A protein has these predicted regions:
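Positively charged n-region of N-terminal signal peptides that target proteins for export
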Residues: 1-4, 142
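Sec-dependent N-terminal signal peptides
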Residues: 4-16
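Subset of outer-membrane beta-barrel
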Residues: 21-362
Length: 362
């Protein structure tokens, strides 16, 4: 009863957080970057998977658990232009307190030449974002688990800097018989504590997300569906002022899409579709489509791969290597690399090898 009450309070908090915030501009948008190859390959949305992969856990803290204890994950992404970002993640489980994780994220936007209003050079400067995340997860029962993250955020752009805090809260359900996993996540609830400029507070990039995945029983497939921005219906960036709408060649009037077309476009902008194929125990292939990215980044004059992403992950004796690529626009295809180590598994293998060697010698 106590566990169900705790879960109910948590879900109510998620709903309230989503209801109480509205869309619009925000600060600290680097928090929404994908810091794991599996996340990138599956469309850069929330994923809900009950397995041994530690690389995505900081985005879904409810699945931080004992099976990932003593794991390290490193990520590097070659983004656009001079921009690169990286992260390092570690998790450990304490029997009574639960499972804890820590991650540091760094985004470097490169160096720039400063200019004054007269066009004179003022010297070079850099721009960087950093976030330190502390996560916690705990199983309430074999089927239910919860988790939370606390994020310390720092941004420095030339002489301007900002500091803020944000939290994530998540709850997950797992059915081992159906191989079904569900997660609800309230993400980036927080605010600036120190603003870039005086009296100009901006909100963090809040999102309310839901994800499900299911491993099919007789084929090596797992499908993923994730929903984002559940607190807001209209996802069209331009609204009625869209400068890319077609015009009638005779009257030069704007051709607005039908209400039905607008409805389904908005509906699918909230959904990411992903598929994992596991042809062998050590290999996973991923493919996904993000309709919102496609609509925002597509080129009208020709077909585009915008919104598609793909990748793979190798898992060999406690060592995971992952690669993913995501398409935004021609020439804008970030590459993401992941390396993850489970030190408990590596230690276990080392002990087994020593035992076999001793057995042969005796």
């Amino acid at each position: 009863m106590r566990k169900h009450f705790t879960l109910g309070i948590f879900l109510l908090f998620c709903w309230f957080a989503g209801y109480s915030q509205t869309g619009g501009g925000s600060v600290y948008n680097f928090l929404d970057f994908s810091y794991a190859s599996r996340l990138t390959a599956l469309g850069n949305g929330l994923i809900s998977v009950h397995d041994d992969d530690p690389t995505f856990l900081i985005t879904n803290p409810s699945y931080i658990g004992s099976r990932h204890s003593n794991s390290l994950a490193l990520n590097f992404t070659n983004y656009f232009g001079q921009t690169n970002y990286a992260s390092a993640f570690y998790t450990y489980t304490f029997p009574k307190a639960g499972s804890f994780a820590a991650e540091v994220r760094y985004v470097g936007y490169g160096t720039f030449q400063g200019m004054d209003e007269a066009g004179l050079e003022t010297g070079r400067f850099s721009a960087n974002d950093i976030a330190l995340t502390l996560g916690w997860g705990r199983e309430l029962s074999p089927n239910f688990s919860i988790g939370a993250n606390l994020k310390f955020i720092f941004c420095g752009y030339e002489m301007y800097n900002s500091f803020g805090l944000a939290v994530d809260v998540a709850g997950s359900y797992y059915n081992p018989d159906k191989r079904l996993s569900l997660t609800l996540l309230a993400k980036n609830i927080g605010s600036e504590l120190k603003t870039f400029t005086p009296d100009n507070f901006e909100r963090t990039p809040f999102d309310l997300q839901f994800a499900l995945s299911q491993r099919l029983e007789h084929v090596p497939f797992r499908y993923h569906i994730s929903l984002h921005h559940l607190y807001r219906w209209n996802m069209n960036y331009y609204g009625d002022d869209n400068p890319f709408l077609e015009t009638d060649g005779m009257t030069n009037e704007i051709i607005y899409p039908s209400k039905v077309s607008q409805f389904f476009d908005n509906f699918f902008r909230h959904i990411n579709f992903g598929l994992e194929i596991e042809p062998a125990k050590f290999l996973s292939l991923q493919l996904a489509y993000n309709h919102n990215i496609h609509q925002e980044m597509k080129i009208l004059a020709r077909r585009s791969m915008a919104g598609f992403s793909y990748g793979f992950m190798l898992n060999i004796k406690g060592v995971r290597f992952g690669f993913a690529r995501q398409h935004f626009a021609p020439g804008a295809t970030p590459n993401c690399f992941n390396l993850a180590l489970n030190f408990n598994e590596l230690s276990k293998q080392h002990q087994e090898k020593k035992q076999k060697k001793l057995t042969r010698e005796t």
